[in-house]
């Protein structure tokens, strides 16, 4: 179940992937002005269509939205299948050592 998009959740998702508002707007097709007003917590709401576009853009970037389930909504990055720009498998942080650290 996807959580309700809140200004705080949107800011967290942007921080996770390093996007500025203009990046989020470009990737989602939702205007910078609307995203900025939404994030300001001034009572501006996103329509279900706009929220869906925002969710889709961030999910494409690897963000996983976590439903509340009693612990609070949140975001995390999906574990990459392979390294960006290569065919090599990505190593988990705990698997890195001096012999495989480039």
Predicted regions and their residues:
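Short, solvent-exposed alpha-helical "recognition" segments
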Residues: 41-48
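A detector for short, charged/polar N-terminal pre-domain segments
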Residues: 1-5
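DNA major-groove recognition helix of helix-turn-helix/homeodomain DNA-binding modules
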Residues: 29, 48-66
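DNA-binding alpha-helical recognition surfaces that contact promoter or target DNA
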Residues: 9-12, 26, 37, 56
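Short, charged recognition helix plus adjacent turn
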Residues: 63-100
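Short basic helix-loop element that most often maps to the first helix and adjoining turn
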Residues: 9-23, 83-84
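Short alpha-helical DNA-recognition segment
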Residues: 19-37
């Amino acid at each position: 179940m996807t959580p309700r998009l809140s200004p705080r959740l949107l800011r967290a998702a942007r921080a996770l992937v390093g996007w500025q508002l203009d990046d989020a707007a470009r990737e989602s097709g939702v205007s910078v002005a609307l995203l900025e007003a939404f994030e300001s917590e001034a009572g501006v709401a996103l329509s279900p269509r706009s929220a869906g576009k925002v969710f889709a853009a961030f999910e494409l970037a690897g963000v996983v939205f976590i439903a509340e389930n009693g612990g609070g909504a949140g975001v995390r990055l999906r574990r990459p299948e392979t390294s960006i720009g290569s065919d090599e498998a990505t190593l988990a942080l705990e698997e890195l050592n001096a012999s495989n650290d480039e």
